[in-house]
Amino acid sequence: MTERLLRYFRDKQQDVQSEKTYDTQCPFCSMQCKMQLVEQTIVTRKKYTAIGIDNPTTQGRLCIKGMNAHQHALNSSRITRPLLKKNGEFMPVSWEEALNHIKDQVTMIQTEHGHDAMAVYGSASITNEEAYLLGKFARVGLQTKYIDYNGRLCMSAAATAANQTFGADRGLTNPLSDIPHTRVIILAGTNIAECQPTIMPYFEKAKENGAYFIAIDPRETATTKIADLHLKIKPGTDAALANGLVKIIIDEQLINEDFIQSRTNGFEELKQHTDSLDLNDIAEQTSVSLVDIRKAAVKFAKETSGMLFTARGIEQQTDGTAAVKGFLNMVLITGKIGKPYSGYGAITGQGNGQGAREHGQKADQLPGYRSIENEEHRAHIAKVWGIHQDELPRKGVSAYEMMEKINDGDIKGLFLMCSNPAVSSPNANLVKKALRRLTFFVAIDLFISETAKYADVILPASSYLEDEGTMTNVEGRVTLREASRPCPGEAKHDWQIICDLASALGKGRYFSYTSAEDIFNELREASRGGIADYSGISYGRLRREGGIHWPCPESDHPGTGRLFTESFAHPDQKAALSVIPNEPPVPKEKPTADYPLYLTTGRVMSHYLTGVQTRKSAALAARHFESFMEIHPQTAATYNIEDRVLVKIESPRGSITVRSKLSEQIRKDTVFVPIHWADAQNVNDLIGEALDPACKMPGFKVCAVRIIPI
């Protein structure tokens, strides 16, 4: 009898009493994989299962992060009511009290110090509608010039390089479906297998079809394993390597003369520059043998088709823009763009890293990828917004420079949405000091993050399960993510929060939207005629078609999967070749007697950005529950460091403590630390404040450090 009862109760615990399905897409990387979350109620508990859904980009694939994304969205530590700091403690309050307090504080600051005493810090993880609205809120609601976003720390070098070279910036110039058919692929500073795993089947298919892979990375990674040739470069020397590759292609007459003559400018200047370079010097500077540099250059040039992919490895440097432009020189002089199976891809890191940089939350930008300093562009947006052109503020400063202005006392108040600069910024100790200096700080987030804890008010935002709007993936394909689950407690859609803030500040007439679709329809008009033209895209089309590449200027336009087939986006329709110095204009830190090792940073598969979301996921956190320092065994031996012991890492900015991980996959002069942890494990406490002069990207990938066993 007892055994039968136990069996009965065990079986009962497996009975599904009810089941709900939520259609959504992954909130993490730029592939934006479509999925369903299945919620099963079993007695008194709930069980969740994520299922990949077939779509044009990833054909139903999910990675480990996507499979477990719901764990942070459903986490009990979610903020579900507005929080107001009273006597140093956060207390739940009504929306009315929170908004009235915000109105009073913002009014006081701007009355005393002017409109530009307030600033806005955005995110590349929010929807296109929210990015658009945040830019409008800064410039119309607050009338401040100070707005930028965390994508400045992620995509700004690649975006600036593409704009300067091609006249337009889109993650991929050609569709992902080209990858399996191309003949040669360069992966420069990208660890796709861990950062965007659902792209890897495209590369694996290319490998099966005989493509030759060249990887450029100071580490051996899951991605470099696919390579036929791995250039294990010294950190920070990517621009010099690009020059060496270009020089060999020119010197050995492997260029596409017809393409250069008809579709580019600047070749003679480029050739004069490369003529002055010494390949032996480049080999020594980069620590890559001349034999391997030549092998890579010749292979890329001689194949009939080829693709170049870059990511943060070469972009997050103080000459990241120049390094990317150097590699784009190679694409252009071989004519490998604007035709099938050839092109360039900047592998976008954040979920909406593409769309978020197109529609106005950047310091120098207006919607549609327009410039805030261009009078025609200003007039167009002012008309859409119903304001006078002169009311539009001018250009502001970059994300890190905003923090410097806060620290200097020029900016008194801050609105921050879905970002964590106390962890993600370089010289993070200065950022934390700056946040403490703010007169007033409002954070809009899911959790009390390492940054939000400094806020005076925290407003509860929506997760990917509850939020609604469009996202633009790595190939420039706009997709629709509809709200499938109600917000918990008193949390609201992010766009609703922005509208409520504008209304509280007396600007509600400019923000009278009733849905994300309302906002998107205005965004379409704002983008009309711009580089990133969404005017022909509608929610109805996205529901029917599953995604549309921009530019899409008409409702019957199919979208543009391949860019630059006949012309580039500069006024003369030609691409610009660039002269790139081997040494950057802003000197990079190099090892010294006091700080004898290079530090470089990056990601691991189970975590995302600063880890605020993934550290809330039990399944993901269990895979990597703490940070680590990857170090070569021979280097470790010189410091008497064994595997999995605590080590202090110091730079001129600060110190952190992490656990050692001995690995022969890294250079002997370099250590690697991932970016996903905070406090005593926050590697960005070590990173310098120097910025790329072209795009204001910090130099995350190169830092001089010393290590001390504990």
UniProtKB/Swiss-Prot annotation:
Enzyme class: oxidoreductase
Gene Ontology molecular function terms on file: 4 iron, 4 sulfur cluster binding; metal ion binding; molybdopterin cofactor binding; oxidoreductase activity
UniProt entry tagged with the keyword rRNA-binding: no
EC number in record: 1.7.-.-
Entry note: cofactor: Binds 1 [4Fe-4S] cluster. Binds 1 molybdenum-bis(molybdopterin guanine dinucleotide) (Mo-bis-MGD) cofactor per subunit.
InterPro entries per UniProt: Asp_de-COase-like_dom_sf (IPR009010), MoPterin_dinucl-bd_dom (IPR006657), Mopterin_OxRdtase (IPR006656), Mopterin_OxRdtase_4Fe-4S_dom (IPR006963), Mopterin_OxRdtase_prok_CS (IPR006655), MopterinOxRdtase_cofactor_BS (IPR027467), Prok_molybdopt-oxidoreductase (IPR050123)
Pfam families xrefs: Molybdop_Fe4S4, Molybdopterin, Molydop_binding
Domain 4Fe-4S Mo/W bis-MGD-type: 19-77
CDD domains: MopB_CT_Fdh-Nap-like (cd00508), MopB_Nitrate-R-NapA-like (cd02754)
Binding residues for [4Fe-4S] cluster: C26, C29, C33, C63
Protein origin, superkingdom: Bacteria
Pathway(s) it belongs to: Nitrogen metabolism; nitrate reduction (denitrification); dinitrogen from nitrate: step 1/4
Entry keyword set: 4Fe-4S, Iron, Iron-sulfur, Metal-binding, Molybdenum, Nitrate assimilation, Oxidoreductase
Job description of the protein: Nitrate reductase is a key enzyme involved in the first step of nitrate assimilation in plants, fungi and bacteria.
Name this polypeptide is given: Assimilatory nitrate reductase catalytic subunit
Originating species: Bacillus subtilis (strain 168)
